[in-house]
Amino acid sequence: MKKVRCSAVIIITLVMMLLLSSCSSWTFIRYIYEYHREYYEAEDFLPSGFASYESVKYDHDKKILLFFFTDTMTVKVKYDDFYIAKKNEVEQTYKFLTEPVESDMLEGHYLIPVTEFEYKGFHMRVADGGDYPHKFGIVGYNDDTKEIVYLWFYDTDFDYIASPEQDKEQAMIEFVENNFDGL
């Protein structure tokens, strides 16, 4: 009887180890795939180089809840005397939204409630060409500290930023506060 019980424990342990190792391999492969997909989607928005910068801060935050995830990237660049030239270059490189984006599905709800807003001393502008509100970028300037910040947001399950009863600018500020810890 003891041999049977011991054999059963060994078999169950081996099966569990096999299952756990196969899950971890799948998770690792999926992680690599997800990383490359997210990187290349954000690559079109995020800057590829920084000329004459004083410092660069990069923050990549991924929040996972069961099958849903939110992926955000923050690049904050501090410039010296080159700031004005870099700001003008960014203004010419990016196209920005000129009007809020309202939801076609949910009446009165805004995917992008405002195209420009102030946040922590930065004048923020929403970049044009995103898949609102699932995937888009924001660029911000702070003339006092000579900093430019690039925010990238990706969440396939996100529905809207502002409901009809919310203040539109405050909703956008709360969106940035809740999703971009690195700012």
Model-derived regions, located:
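Extracytoplasmic electrostatic interaction patches
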Residues: 89-183
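Short secondary-structure boundary micro-motifs
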Residues: 2, 59-61, 122-124
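N-terminal export/targeting and maturation segments
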Residues: 23-96
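A generic structural signal for short, solvent-exposed coil/turn residues
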Residues: 15, 67-69, 116, 131
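Alpha-helical protein-protein interaction elements
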Residues: 18, 27, 31-32, 86, ...
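Intrinsically disordered, low-complexity segments enriched in polar/charged residues with Gly/Pro
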Residues: 4-5, 43-47, 125-128
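Detector for methionine-enriched segments
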Residues: 1, 16-17, 73, 105, ...
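Gram-positive cell-envelope targeting signals
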Residues: 1-37
